[in-house]
Amino acid sequence: MEESEQVLPLLTNPKDLTNPSYASSSSSSSEPRDETEDLLLPISDENEEEEEENSPIRQVALTVPTTDDPSLPVLTFRMWVLGTLSCILLSFLNQFFWYRTEPLTISAISAQIAVVPLGRLMAAKITDRVFFQGSKWQFTLNPGPFNVKEHVLITIFANAGAGSVYAIHVVTVVKAFYMKNITFFVSFIVIVTTQVLGFGWAGIFRKYLVEPAAMWWPANLVQVSLFRALHEKEERTKGGLTRTQFFVIAFVCSFAYYVFPGYLFQIMTSLSWVCWFFPSSVMAQQIGSGLHGLGVGAIGLDWSTISSYLGSPLASPWFATANVGVGFVLVIYVLVPICYWLDVYKAKTFPIFSSSLFSSQGSKYNITSIIDSNFHLDLPAYERQGPLYLCTFFAISYGVGFAALSATIMHVALFHGREIWEQSKESFKEKKLDVHARLMQRYKQVPEWWFWCILVTNVGATIFACEYYNDQLQLPWWGVLLACTVAIIFTLPIGIITAITNQAPGLNIITEYIIGYIYPGYPVANMCFKVYGYISMQQAITFLQDFKLGHYMKIPPRTMFMAQIVGTLISCFVYLTTAWWLMETIPNICDSVTNSVWTCPSDKVFYDASVIWGLIGPRRIFGDLGLYKSVNWFFLVGAIAPILVWLASRMFPRQEWIKLINMPVLISATSSMPPATAVNYTTWVLAGFLSGFVVFRYRPNLWQRYNYVLSGALDAGLAFMGVLLYMCLGLENVSLDWWGNELDGCPLASCPTAPGIIVEGCPLYT
């Protein structure tokens, strides 16, 4: 059995599969373009004579087209216009909603759908006149019908604006939480360098994470399915629906339905029925609360509850979903209850689930009192106030992060070490390619030196900024080089896990741990080290995922590279400008005491982490001076767990299910908590089971036609209705005050149960 087959559950003989054909609606009328010819390379006769092999991954074989039309124009006027507008609009809206108590993320799928009628309108109305005809500068604003390759590049622009720019956390925490100074220029340098640094790592690891068929990036299949539904002409089967018809129906239903959980009946976000039966029991509400407790029996009837933190369960392969589910059960339903009811780390003094920082008496820790005028830890003030405490779940979540780190390294070494070594050797000689890689050979690749130039220039600019503006950033030059070292070590193993399972173990904890031990008492330095070590790696994985999308849709790599660079730079500027405007114009933004809708929940978690790892330092919390030193044993647990699975797979080679146990995914299952909550997981796993196991196994034809299309329709309907509700009602603060909008209905879930601890609204235990 090949190495890739040891971890992939759904491999099959390619000859048993149907190969979906590619038929763009515009391919028949488009003429070859000079821009495309410049990106083409001849395909050897030897490759043309090879037997066509589809992808060994069944989901890819059923979803991705195996043909290409290189004559389709790509870098068109409408691509630049619609791509730039999509990037700007999504960047603004996502950052605008990011600071709100209930943040709304507008995915690239929204733009992916919205630009279709606009692109076709531009194709119908804009002149097709050829300017400077006969010269090397000739161009036209309208090269023909709106085609799928233009559409893919527009979506790449939209992807740049579809998520948050992580380095914005640094700016927000410094300005809104610590109330210190950081200039716009310095903020822009930090944001751009962290985003662009990922291109360097992406270039280094392309041959390992894009070209191999085993690195299939499940999330991309949602977009591939949507592109095909929007562009291919499909015959309607008797009694059935085309994918386009199905998408429209599902989109309308999702759009109309979200008015209930999004506005009229918000309790649908988390139906914690255990709390309804025990309205006066703290223990019952701790167990049953989907938002503030363990979420036993809790379920959400809201697509945003399902997909907001873990992504679409319809895009996750079942074995990965099962690993997440098992990891969630072990942590939330086994480890946390045992530690809480045994009062480990004074657990009963604090809520069972919280990201807040506490004093020994259960009150919120006064952070500002332990910071001196130089933005460093005031040690005498810290000793007067006493040590910082975490709720037991928060402490365990850090331990789980430690275990996930060592498990990732060990898992990749054991299950993919030979594969990585063989790939390294194959990069210097001819290798057998699948159909998608062979089709991409006709296009000129991005030269390695492009990536190296970006990497070296970016690292140099980062070192200069950190040294010249050290009073604002606090990070010394050696910290930048150390962060880059951490990123380059972990990009490949975490990239492999993500490319196979659609789940990414987090690296943020180890970056915080390293710099916190080496350079304690400097919170901004800790945050900067984290974004250069962690986010540059995350950006690399995002760029690699986009490269794989281009690989599936046969986009010229140099064109894809250009779109990624331009989209990233535009999104950085728009994100920062929007965040700066909000922080300058909204009084007390991120202040939860004011009952404002602008409470910045994710930035609060980032701020708490900067206090734990940067200001106070891991030595005083997890080291020899701390209360939680035993949490470090999780490193050993994480290293041992993959070895046990590997040994079991060798001892029982016929037990295929053993090879599907992915310890990095299983151990890091709860890494999104907080801000994710239990109900996000329970509902996500249920939806993933129905899609990835039940439908895929018993109705494979139905799954093939509609699964990924349904995922895109649910995302899009939610996003459009979410924006509409906010623009029409949210801006005017029009709300409904009734029991159906009381989220969760578990007011006692956050109460402590230790004797003598007084918290407003909670019963006093004696």
UniProtKB/Swiss-Prot annotation:
Spans through the membrane: 79-99, 104-124, 154-174, 184-204, 247-267, 287-307, 324-344, 390-410, 446-466, 477-497, 509-529, 561-581, 627-647, 676-696, 709-729
Region of interest (Disordered), ranges: 1-58
One BP term from GO: protein transport
Annotated GO CC locations: membrane
Principal localisation: membrane
Subcellular localization, as worded in the UniProt entry: Membrane
Molecular-function annotations in GO: oligopeptide transmembrane transporter activity
Tissue expr: Expressed in the major and the first-order veins and in the hydathodes of the leaves. In the roots, expressed in circular zones surrounding lateral root primordia and in some part of the root epidermis. Expressed also in the sepals and the cortical tissues of the stem, but not in the conducting bundles, the petals or the reproductive tissues.
Keywords: Membrane, Peptide transport, Protein transport, Transmembrane, Transmembrane helix, Transport
Compositional bias ranges of the Acidic residues kind: 45-54
Keyword S-adenosyl-L-methionine: no
Topology class, membrane: Multi-pass membrane protein
NCBIfam families: ISP4_OPT (TIGR00727), OPT_sfam (TIGR00728)
Biological role stated in the UniProt entry: Involved in the translocation of tetra- and pentapeptides across the cellular membrane in an energy-dependent manner. May also transport cadmium complexes.
Recorded family membership: Belongs to the oligopeptide OPT transporter (TC 2.A.67.1) family.
Protein name: Oligopeptide transporter 7
Organism: Arabidopsis thaliana
Name of the coding gene: OPT7
